[in-house]
Amino acid sequence: MIKLRDISNVNPEEFDEVWIICRSIKKLDRTILDNPKVKHVPDLSPSMELFYAYRKWANQGVWNTFLWNEKYVPNFLEQMRNDVKAKTYLQQLTDESKSKNIALVCFCRDEKMCHRSIVGGILYHMGASIEIKDSYEGYHI
């Protein structure tokens, strides 16, 4: 079973694996990174271009559900659609979700407007055993 979490609310000991799906892990405590259950998988994170666009919108105070739905989501889905390595990881997660307890984590506190919700929707449509909110079911590649 896959569960979506923000990194500040995850205890690696509660999971078989913890997948950190963000580009940078510089701000993370070494005790988390040194845990053998923890994997850093930047291939399931937004491209630098999309991440910087998000940061720009957030810093300008204009980040909202319109930009999320009209700009961020379509760009991230397109990125996942065209990334062979990302698709390999998505398939691995789908397969492992049947026998392992896995946390997908990122720094974002608002899960609804975080790429992990999109990844969750993609995994749901791929047949993964995943705990998601209904609103994520619209995300697929």
What are these regions, as identified by a protein language model?
Residues 1-141:
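Residues lining hydrophobic/aromatic ligand-binding pockets adjacent to catalytic sites
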